[in-house]
Amino acid sequence: SFLKENDRLLTTVVQPAYATLSEGLYSLETSGSAGQTSSISQASPGGIIDTSGALPKGLALLPDGKTYYHHLLFAETGSSRSEKELVQMLLVQFQKEQSAIRNLASQSPSLITLLSEENTAVFPLAEPEEMLSDLQARMKNDFPVSSPVPTVTVKDVVPSLEPYSAPAFYLTTPLGDSDNNVIYINRRNSPQGLELYTTLAHEGFPGHLYQTVYSNRIFSDMHTDPARKLIWYGGYLEGWALYVEFLSYDYAATLLEQAGQPDAAQVARLEKHTRSLQLCMYTLLDLLIHGEGAGYDQVAEVLGKFGIDSPGTCEAIYTYI
């Protein structure tokens, strides 16, 4: 009876509510009310969502947009650092990654060719379940074992949700059942090989799954205030998952070496630094566009310094951010 009631509420209450919300927000964005142009559209031609074909604008160009972005930045990351401080940190990290890439390339000149041609050996593990088991085994030297060891089931995203779902995601368990966990794989755009391995590290072990189960069990044993479970720690949650994702590139490199694939192991190490480099670049652009009001021309100029000069690629990156 509970399942039937849940299905009834989803189909007759939740889904129609989301449809109404979507229609209402789109109406406000594009037309305003009572024949008046919306404040978003007044701030910049087309606002954030532009139906005229022009490129979108950043938050900084909206009324109080910079103030809003500052609060959003704090709420999502938990960091009280200013935008300028974050930019400096990102630039330092960017330089570190560039240096690491140069060192790897000098040690193995063929690496760049292997990476650009995607001419790496077949990854030793093919199935998600195998990868999760391998990650669980390798993380034991770096992280406490959570007992009993949580189980995880890998399921496919249903076809109707494939166009809207991430390549993979961990479904947070109920507070009272941390032993049975589920990770969903989107077969429509799921990564393979090394990329799937590091994605599962981000979502599973030692990522979100391990993070959630271990934290819930520790907090329960310590009898901490249940209100803690209502608080959002976005920077901590995603920061942890990204940290262990980078660590999993090292796990993958060791796995590849053990499988007799030293060149592929070096490619995995190179991928780790290029991934970090990419995230640094995207974060810098986010701060420039939404924090300082940079437009497409300024962003294209910055991307040009990174060796990205294709107008189509620059426009795609700008629009995405």
Predicted segments, located by residue:
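N-terminal maturation segment of proteins
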Residues: 1-321
